[in-house]
UniProtKB/Swiss-Prot annotation:
Residues in CCHC-type zinc fingers: 547-564, 576-593
Annotated source species: Mason-Pfizer monkey virus (MPMV)
EC number assigned by the record: 3.6.1.23, 3.4.23.-, 2.7.7.49, 2.7.7.7
Residue stretches in coiled coil: 216-257
UniProt name for this protein: Gag-Pro-Pol polyprotein
Active site as annotated: D785
Amino acid sequence: MGQELSQHERYVEQLKQALKTRGVKVKYADLLKFFDFVKDTCPWFPQEGTIDIKRWRRVGDCFQDYYNTFGPEKVPVTAFSYWNLIKELIDKKEVNPQVMAAVAQTEEILKSNSQTDLTKTSQNPDLDLISLDSDDEGAKSSSLQDKGLSSTKKPKRFPVLLTAQTSKDPEDPNPSEVDWDGLEDEAAKYHNPDWPPFLTRPPPYNKATPSAPTVMAVVNPKEELKEKIAQLEEQIKLEELHQALISKLQKLKTGNETVTHPDTAGGLSRTPHWPGQHIPKGKCCASREKEEQIPKDIFPVTETVDGQGQAWRHHNGFDFAVIKELKTAASQYGATAPYTLAIVESVADNWLTPTDWNTLVRAVLSGGDHLLWKSEFFENCRDTAKRNQQAGNGWDFDMLTGSGNYSSTDAQMQYDPGLFAQIQAAATKAWRKLPVKGDPGASLTGVKQGPDEPFADFVHRLITTAGRIFGSAEAGVDYVKQLAYENANPACQAAIRPYRKKTDLTGYIRLCSDIGPSYQQGLAMAAAFSGQTVKDFLNNKNKEKGGCCFKCGKKGHFAKNCHEHAHNNAEPKVPGLCPRCKRGKHWANECKSKTDNQGNPIPPHQGNRVEGPAPGPETSLWGSQLCSSQQKQPISKLTRATPGSAGLDLCSTSHTVLTPEMGPQALSTGIYGPLPPNTFGLILGRSSITMKGLQVYPGVIDNDYTGEIKIMAKAVNNIVTVSQGNRIAQLILLPLIETDNKVQQPYRGQGSFGSSDIYWVQPITCQKPSLTLWLDDKMFTGLIDTGADVTIIKLEDWPPNWPITDTLTNLRGIGQSNNPKQSSKYLTWRDKENNSGLIKPFVIPNLPVNLWGRDLLSQMKIMMCSPNDIVTAQMLAQGYSPGKGLGKKENGILHPIPNQGQSNKKGFGNFLTAAIDILAPQQCAEPITWKSDEPVWVDQWPLTNDKLAAAQQLVQEQLEAGHITESSSPWNTPIFVIKKKSGKWRLLQDLRAVNATMVLMGALQPGLPSPVAIPQGYLKIIIDLKDCFFSIPLHPSDQKRFAFSLPSTNFKEPMQRFQWKVLPQGMANSPTLCQKYVATAIHKVRHAWKQMYIIHYMDDILIAGKDGQQVLQCFDQLKQELTAAGLHIAPEKVQLQDPYTYLGFELNGPKITNQKAVIRKDKLQTLNDFQKLLGDINWLRPYLKLTTGDLKPLFDTLKGDSDPNSHRSLSKEALASLEKVETAIAEQFVTHINYSLPLIFLIFNTALTPTGLFWQDNPIMWIHLPASPKKVLLPYYDAIADLIILGRDHSKKYFGIEPSTIIQPYSKSQIDWLMQNTEMWPIACASFVGILDNHYPPNKLIQFCKLHTFVFPQIISKTPLNNALLVFTDGSSTGMAAYTLTDTTIKFQTNLNSAQLVELQALIAVLSAFPNQPLNIYTDSAYLAHSIPLLETVAQIKHISETAKLFLQCQQLIYNRSIPFYIGHVRAHSGLPGPIAQGNQRADLATKIVASNINTNLESAQNAHTLHHLNAQTLRLMFNIPREQARQIVKQCPICVTYLPVPHLGVNPRGLFPNMIWQMDVTHYSEFGNLKYIHVSIDTFSGFLLATLQTGETTKHVITHLLHCFSIIGLPKQIKTDNGPGYTSKNFQEFCSTLQIKHITGIPYNPQGQGIVERAHLSLKTTIEKIKKGEWYPRKGTPRNILNHALFILNFLNLDDQNKSAADRFWHNNPKKQFAMVKWKDPLDNTWHGPDPVLIWGRGSVCVYSQTYDAARWLPERLVRQVSNNNQSRE
């Protein structure tokens, strides 16, 4: 290594000198780093042995490829600079001898440093290798091959060894015609270990080697296929070869053919290949360095062949670099990005087992994508397995997925190569099916091109979406091409349209390659300048170009070039009769007459007169242009159909397509006026064309009209095509009768088409337009007022027995009425022609006349017409037919309303002297009832920048939509935004505070409507209302309460405030208001169409009826009513035909099924998951054939821990139940009810609980009892009675009828017994008039319900038995059970603490001890005496902790008995004489005696702690148990363990005797409500605690507390408090002085002086917290009870180390206490005093009682000296 390094350094040094001679100075270290980079990038360079311009350029090419692949961050900054310098050094022919010497020396170094011996060849004559290994390694390999074995090392994976293709014999060592420079360049790339996997075959290393060079490469089967096709291209045609290869490849994938591989050299490893890949024999090379390092593109399964030709397969691990690269690509670009798919395809070119694929996918993809891939992979494997089964090759689903017997890796390694190919195909296909990152998964038709989106990007999105839907984009290429045009933007459509059928998808892309944002902008500007829309501009742009001749009308030339009207051939035109004066033959513009031939004045010439003809032939978007050869034809050219035809046929001159949306269109006929003299024309449509759906409007053609006669026509319902030359109308010529009417114009000429003399008008006269109508059969006469929004009836005409209500609406006109009255119900109006409708008029007093408003006139189809030309044209354009009414069926009122006035009616008078303007009441939701009018203000929460931006955008959208308005309301609640899965934001408002102030409305629909109640055979229409909440306005008085604020960051600006105008989401009453509003809107429809079955639930409406035409008419009226109410129907959600989707069901003909449901078992992990799943299943049960017994294992999973996140898992039984659910969902269906047939209710004896079914030849609805019984022990016959009650209730609820027949499993005699001995059966059958039977209909579907074996009581007798053993049982809450018989008593201990359950254990012991003997059992438990007899007939026992288990055990003992027994009840402790009372007393006494014996001190301590939560020291002293046992009792308590121990008592000044010094304070405990103020006083000598609950902490509350304390322990000498106002007041000072109590306060804001009472607060609150969670009465007690219990514990139960409680210390004070004697120094005068007794030794301080001054003093410990060890007793 040292020699090599020195050579390398010498090489770099010489190169540096050579550069220096050219004036280039470089650092040695930088140059050394540069050549290290050269070596890493071009590992072949040191082996070349020479350096020249050709090899150096190859180095530059490697640099460039490395830069393009890995980016600039991987390439040193100076790399290309140094390369250029050295290139100039080598390329330029130097004359400087120093430079040439340096170059020569450099070449020598390269030659001597070459590490490869390329002269040796392999010993195998069939396959020569260029070995880079040492001689020793080769010898070892040779020896191993002689023995017929491969290397003993673990087989390594080698790339495929390929030879160069030559035209010579394979044994020729000198190939010719090879581009060695290019081959070496590619080989150098391959040897770079950092290079990504190459898919092409690189050429050999060096042309100088004598043997045929071969290199390592991963062969791509597609490239190999292309090479084969290229070799055979000259022999056969390309298409035949392509088809043959495709057929062969398909056979390989299905396993019909196997792949054979040629033998290779012994010990040589070969990589698996795609089926059909051929590995040519030849000379290969293998590098030992490469053998020691597994290449990154070799994958798990490899195959080696030993010297004997035996193939061995090996499994290797994945290279981490490949997984990392694939993981990075999937994360950054997406799992289906082209780059990611390229890596996946390169991986798929190798042999990967199913386990390897699963490992790779799980490592690369996310959890969700992994599951998606796995499901798609399994689906692909199923399809492949089916094809394999047909082919008979034995490759089944288990082999393809690596499951079952093929789950081990060893088994998968032995797969056939063709099977590997099928696995790779299934895996890659599944990978391509993964969803695109960030794509919500829209449908293919929903992919549309954006306005500025490049067309190529749009096509790419289409192809990607098609690939996911069809499996591959090629499968839907025609569909993609169609959508690429239809969903393109207008600009691209215009570019494609001329070539749409002439090119393919790539041609589309080329045509639209230049269309971008700038093109769109220019297009919009061009359309704007031309006065057209962009669409019209593009359509006209592509039409035939060229001018139109204004003379002949033909295209292709202009008027100046017209040959038909050349000036030299033109005949002079002679004027006819002047149309102005009609008195001479001259031109009208030359007429100078002032009057016509009738003497009427002629208006002078001024301005533009009648509009002339269009400048050119008419073009239409929907029709073809007028044929250029069409000439203007006169009336005389028209033909008649037959000699007797009255009309002349009119034909269309263009091919036209009409749709209903286009409305009336004018069709050209090519016929021009004028008509023959003294005639006028009437245009009528032909009956044959009317039958085709084309409506021709009648028209009048004037005699003096000279323009083109056109036909007004429209398509009524469907698209109609009018071909050129079709006869569609007739022109009838009628005689013209001239009258003396005034003429407006001298002549019509070529004016606008149509008559100018006919208008649809109602003359205005002096009479009032009155109208007589009948409201609920009472006649009313009123004035037609088109300016009034509503109808108004005067109070004087209103019947007094008709109800009216007050409104919140103000009616305004010339007069004004505030809060007028309105009819409480809708009235039915009727006119003389029996037209009718509903109306809800207002009632106003003192009104001169009744007013019919627009709410009524609109229902009557009354029209207002105008004689104005513009208005007439507008009405014609909108579809108005002369003589016909408006509407789709034109069935409105045809004639004007009679205008006869009534003379006996007075005028308006002073009330209405002008036009009236009465505003209609605004339709809105009902007002909300509020608990309080006090404003509610909740501050707005701060929002992050992204959420604030989203909120601002959403608020702006709502503002533009009119859903909110600006506000200054005193109400405010916060808003927030959440991000949906689709990436869009949603605006929400926290209305909890507002909801708390409103009176909640009840639910209007407590349940979902069922589609089975729709009559059978009815046709249906289902609609969904769009944005229903946002379409319903809030009542104006309620809007201010739903205000919110939009904040700003850093308070940069005042908050913008808004309030909702529509129903807000999150408001508690919004659903109810929505239902009421929609119900009101469709009320008229329900009233008018009573024969229809209409279901309304929230925003879903279903209409069903017998007659389809009536259903459509009802739907039409429903649309009108909803539109009038401001509600909008979502067009995309209108369902008109099967299958319908409604409320989670699919309605297809007579069958009703649930929508396809998929149960995700992998998501079932917690109690919450199972709860939601079973809730959904329970919702589906009325439509499934599932019994409660079928679902019981699933219901059992809900038992256990109540934590929603507690773990749950599926048992085998639960999994089987879930499979039954899936099967039932897939197969279930129910049918609609037929109300003409009897309704039968069937009851089946299914397991656990009975199951009900409504039946009419097919199942209608399944009925189930609740999963949990209402009783712990519910007999089966009582369950059937409950099911009868439930079935009858459901029948009336959903169908409105009682079942005609109830079929149940009991016979008539059994029913009689049930009626006499049970309570439920008489109730269930009460008032039932139908048939009660037990014969089921003969139907196979009914037989699926297995009969349940039911029994009547047989073993348990209702009366005592004769000659039976007498047994008494009893149980105690201590867990002791006992039973006695004759003179024997048996007792045993249980682990139960309930007396009822313990006695049940005793009863089980009796039944177990005497299974074959009759028994008379007596118990003092009434519960057991009633429950045990029910066990014999109970099918399901409700789960209640231990109770269910014991009852099940007892039930099993009863089932196993064959000899009856009796159980009776006896009252305990009755004191009655006799054997029964005495026997019960013996059993009871046995439990009590035993209980007293086992009540040890430890159990007593445990019970005491459970009751009072005493501390460990008190338990130890009170019950004489060890200290550790006492501590364990406290530690095991779940309540006490959460509280810290009470701190040390401290060293505050204390009294020397009881009632000397008290400390007093107030603490708060909020859970006590108004009594949260706890006044606490403590005697500092004994620690005796007193506390009272008060409603405040003022002086009066303090005095009340002290008076209570004085009544218990008397008056103190001194009280110390803080400086609170209750303690420093004058009244409290007077109170203390009156009772001679010294009151002192501590230092302000220093609670340490009150340390004793402060610690007492903590002790008191801790004790309250403990006992309120216990099992004693304080759990449900009052605050005073809880406080008193806590004081009892602290004062009387807690003991100190002297075994005394606080009460003992207070009431039994021992004055003969021994004290230590000390001398002490007074710090004021430095004098010593004493000896005096020590009261308290503190931490650094001592409390000494001065006998001289009779007072205690606190002194520092350094001023105290103990004088003796003798103690003094202080009296």
